[in-house]
């Protein structure tokens, strides 16, 4: 018995609702789960699902089949989301070395809110980085050689422009 995938129904004595029928006992296992997913994943439209037929084929109540199908879709969509996230985070890794036989990385091809293509990884990462963290990211990119001013400033002013302003202020 596994507490993560076991549902326990407790029958409490008391007034029974009119027309209530106890659900029939049934057994569910991984083999039936795989068989159900193999059938459901090939269907083009949710209206094409014959819930009664699935219920009869698996010897499980229709309410359970519906709930299980929704759970299977949720799990598979989450795994796809994680796979996409891992691929995009691997593309953003700055220390990735390319070998001679590697093909060049494909462009990101993401549309921004104005329908313009964002092909540069740096542009995409700047959109995904919150404005409060951008100064810290710039410090990390130059190997920690920044003067620390960029962390305190929320303005996007280059380090050389700040140095020029400081030199002008000190009249050097």
UniProtKB/Swiss-Prot annotation:
Plays a role in autophagy. Functions at the preautophagosomal structure (PAS) in order to form normal autophagosomes under starvation conditions. Also plays a role in mitophagy and regulation of filamentous growth. The keyword rRNA processing does not apply. Transmembrane segments: none annotated. It is found in: Preautophagosomal structure. Residues 114-131 have a biased composition (Polar residues). Belongs to the ATG29 family. Residues 147-158 have a biased composition (Low complexity). Its main location: other. Keywords: Autophagy, Protein transport, Transport. The keyword ATP-binding does not apply. One of its GO terms (molecular function) is SNARE binding. One of its GO terms (biological process) is cellular response to nitrogen starvation. GO terms for cellular component: Atg1/ULK1 kinase complex; phagophore assembly site. This is Autophagy-related protein 29. The lineage of its organism: Eukaryota, Fungi, Dikarya, Ascomycota, Saccharomycotina. Residues 87-158 are annotated as: Disordered. It comes from Eremothecium gossypii (strain ATCC 10895 / CBS 109.51 / FGSC 9923 / NRRL Y-1056) (Yeast).
